[in-house]
Amino acid sequence: MKIMVLNGSPKRETSDTMCMTRAFIKGMNEAGENAVHTIHLIDRHIEYCTGCFSCMKNGGECIHKDDMKGLLEEILESDLLIFSFPLYCYGMPAPMKAFIDRTLPLSSMAMRKVGERYEHVEQADFSHLKYLMICGCGFPNSQHNFELAVAQFKLCFPNHHTIITVPESPMFNVLEAAPVTKPRLALIRQAGRRYAESGKIEPELLEQICSPMIPEDVYAKIANGEA
């Protein structure tokens, strides 16, 4: 399987969320070796979409001549896109949002109705492509935190998507937190293996992964410097 990892964190490899992403990929590779290419979007030259729609009218050619041309070509050659990013103001960091905006050349001006919504018709066949979102945040729980990012991801990629959201994720880069983070990374690694084998993750396993690692009030006290 060809996997394109899109890291939206400005921290690159030291991202808390990338700790989870690496564990997931390690699990996938246990089920069979994959070709993995990790891209730190902060290091790529990606201009902002101007909304001119030129790309939708001329076969996908964007007015900007930057790194997106090569990234779009790689998307078409991939089997799985992993969107790895921390929660910024309840949504995606700017590098990730700029990247997604610039995938517009993969769509055409034509629209079709799917259920109750209208969507643009693709300019290529994406039926084989799967999408995985891995997102961490520094809050003690998930309630009223991830909803915006999750909703946007589902709208952008309505088919073949899987979503992992984990609170208290800054602990993944704290050595003293290893007694609680290592078991969680082991679960994420297990999820990667299951995903590679079956294309899905059991709801029970997802629930374990997405739950707080330590009691919410304890985490809040540590974050506030009260413990």
Please describe what each predicted stretch is:
Residues 1-108, 182-227:
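N-terminal beta1-alpha1-beta2 submodule of the flavodoxin-like/Rossmannoid cofactor-binding fold
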Residues 170-175:
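A short acidic, helix-capping loop that chelates divalent metal ions and anchors anionic groups
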Residues 95, 108-160:
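Short, glycine-/small-residue-rich phosphate/pyrophosphate-handling segment
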Residues 161-169:
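Beta-strand-loop-alpha "switch" segments that mediate conformational coupling across diverse proteins
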Residues 3, 35-36, 131, 160-162:
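Hydrophobic anchor at the start of a short beta-strand
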Residues 8, 41, 135-138, 166:
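Cofactor-binding loop segments of dinucleotide-utilizing enzymes, especially the Rossmann-like FAD-
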